[in-house]
Amino acid sequence: MTAEPNKPCQIKRDYPQLINLYPATADTDAHYLSKLSIYQQRVFEAHSQQKLLVLGQIGLSNGLELLSWWRAHSHLSQRLLLKVFEPNPINAYELKLLWDQSACLTKEPELEPLAQRLLHAEPAAIIGCQRLIFDDGRFTIDLHFGDIQSQLSSLIHSPMHPVQHWLILPHLLQALHHQSHWQMAKLSDDSATIATIGLSESSGLSETTVNRFQACGFTVSDINELGIHQPVTLINHQPDAVLLHERQVLRQQDAKAYAFNPMAAILSSATQSSIAIIGGGLASAHLALSLAERGQGAQVFCKDAELGQGASGNRQGAIYPLLTPENDELSRFFQQAFLFSRRRVQALTSAPADNQTPISHVFCGVLQTAHDERSQLRLDKIIQGQPWPSEIAYAVDAEQANAIAKINLDKPGFFYPLGGWVCPFEYADAAIQKAMQLADVSVSLNTDILAIERQSDGWVLLTEKERLGPFAQLVLANGAELTQFDASNKLQISPFRGQVSHVPAQFQLSQLATVLCANGYLTPSHQGLHCLGASYVKEPKHLDFCPQEQQENLAKMHESYPKQSWLEDIDMSGNNARVGVRMVTRDHFPMMGCAPDVPKIIKDYAQHQLTKESRHYWQTTPAPVHQGLYILGGLGSRGLSSGPLAAECLAAQLCGEPIPLDKATLCKLNPNRMWLRKLLKGKAL
């Protein structure tokens, strides 16, 4: 785990408190893990022909069940997605304390290496879903922290890859409400079953509990009663048709309530479909990687001679979450996304040296400070607005800030200990190289797509000299050129020029040990240079070097840290800088999902305007889209944090798999949201 200077204790609860919240089932039955292993073997045998197996687990306990699934799956070629629902969020530090104090891993030495990999992934005590990907996508964990009913009901049903089986840890059997049973049923395959371990009547496996699950169409089995020679067929069952209909009604209610947020129908076999991606930066590279982990190939078309020549071309970029005082959907999304991106960097750089593309990065933390009275009020609101997990961020006084930065700032701030800086173009290149190792992914450089056309058999891409395709699915992930095509030119997104200054590392300045974020940002040195930026010019007329913006970048640092002697070490005389364009949305969410058919939306609006009936129409009618066309962009100035998770979610959508975001956040990411937000409120376009 990352070491943070002067960090407060990340362990908020002592061992007795933790063991009470996360009781270990194995402590009450010495043969529990052996019985669990038999059950897991039966499950894998019953679904050996599936390329992806989705399983649900209620309760994290001390994590041994999760590690046991990982161990049991390690020799299999199929992919496993394990969705774990735990009401009490826990971080890596407290999880390690549980393991150390209980010595549970000493009894299961095979689990120790897996446990260390889980800790290295730094699960955080945040509400919502955290996706952890291991073994090149073969084993994926979705950690859903928070109220179980809320987490279950926030998810959409995945008809192609529903939950096949549920394991419920005994200490949470009684905590599940009848509504939770039905939400589990909504997310499940028709033949899905429930397993638990009936240690005693007090564990909750009573006749009443069993009857409640059966009333939702489940059969319930006790792992204690599952013999090693039990036939595989007993794992599956077919529930009553009436109960299946009730499940379908729940799914239809969801679909109707979120019809304005279309999730286009996926081809029945995603691995047989052809996918084209236009763009050569972080978004397209990570989409290719997420698809490749699913065995899905793609063709990437980049107009430049190398990848990462657009907004992804900077030498260094800060990686840290965007937080709000309310911890709203934007804030929660960025926490999930930031942690996901951080894990991506770790995974790509921990591969064997001969199988790895280097990514320059240092997780040195990010220190946010105010630069005037208004920004101080805003920062104070964020700090005081929530009991932020200290692995996400914590307040520091001026003395602590100086110690973290290794240069004098003399002002308090908010420190993001898991943050740092990453080289964006190396990050994009490493993702593409990994994708090409895993699946049939190709990259066509110097290929400028001038137009796209929809045909009956897919999308055709036009260059100056040739027609490419058709492709069943086309993703526009082309950064500043996102709106260049007729089908995307109405997207409500704006280009902003950003000039990043490169200044030599010298004297006191070279001692900077963390990323500073105030009015602008300043990175620690990399290859003898610091990055100082960035300007923010809407709809720029040119991308040439601008001396005025260079001086403005310097002035921002003087405003942020006035009268500090190290400011004199910032030498701008070399006029060394890089200019890029980032695409920004008004609400700061990226755009991810089906490309909206804006002319059709406007045409329908003419027929359904400003009445109660029209609001109902837009709420319950699938919003118009360009079939087979998708958008991935609008990453703004925080693409390093948001881009990889947005790409992962789009890859899941393209392949018909469970998406690691809740319904409300998916609506916030939808490229049609600016229009539909008004229409759902009965406002004029």
From Swiss-Prot:
Q: Which GO terms describe its biological process?
A: methylation; tRNA wobble uridine modification
Q: Which UniProt keywords apply?
A: Cytoplasm, FAD, Flavoprotein, Methyltransferase, Multifunctional enzyme, Oxidoreductase, S-adenosyl-L-methionine, Transferase, tRNA processing
Query: Region tRNA (mnm(5)s(2)U34)-methyltransferase: what ranges?
Result: 1-272
Enzyme Commission no: 2.1.1.61, 1.5.-.-
State the species of origin. Shewanella baltica (strain OS185)
Q: What does this protein do?
A: Catalyzes the last two steps in the biosynthesis of 5-methylaminomethyl-2-thiouridine (mnm(5)s(2)U) at the wobble position (U34) in tRNA. Catalyzes the FAD-dependent demodification of cmnm(5)s(2)U34 to nm(5)s(2)U34, followed by the transfer of a methyl group from S-adenosyl-L-methionine to nm(5)s(2)U34, to form mnm(5)s(2)U34.
The record's catalysed reaction(s) read: 5-aminomethyl-2-thiouridine(34) in tRNA + S-adenosyl-L-methionine = 5-methylaminomethyl-2-thiouridine(34) in tRNA + S-adenosyl-L-homocysteine + H(+)
Name listed for the protein in its UniProt record: tRNA 5-methylaminomethyl-2-thiouridine biosynthesis bifunctional protein MnmC
Please give the residue ranges the record annotates as the region FAD-dependent cmnm(5)s(2)U34 oxidoreductase.
278-685
GO CC annotation: cytoplasm
Example of a GO MF term: tRNA (5-methylaminomethyl-2-thiouridylate)(34)-methyltransferase activity
Which family does this protein fall into? In the N-terminal section; belongs to the methyltransferase superfamily. tRNA (mnm(5)s(2)U34)-methyltransferase family.
Q: Which Gene3D superfamilies match?
A: D-Amino Acid Oxidase, subunit A, domain 2, FAD/NAD(P)-binding domain, Vaccinia Virus protein VP39
**InterPro entries, per database record:** FAD-dep_OxRdtase, FAD/NAD-bd_sf, SAM-dependent_MTases_sf, tRNA_MAMT_biosynth_bifunc_MnmC, tRNA_S-uridine_synth_MnmC_C
**Location within or outside the cell:** Cytoplasm
User: Which cofactors, by name?
Assistant: FAD
Taxonomic lineage:
Bacteria, Pseudomonadati, Pseudomonadota, Gammaproteobacteria, Alteromonadales
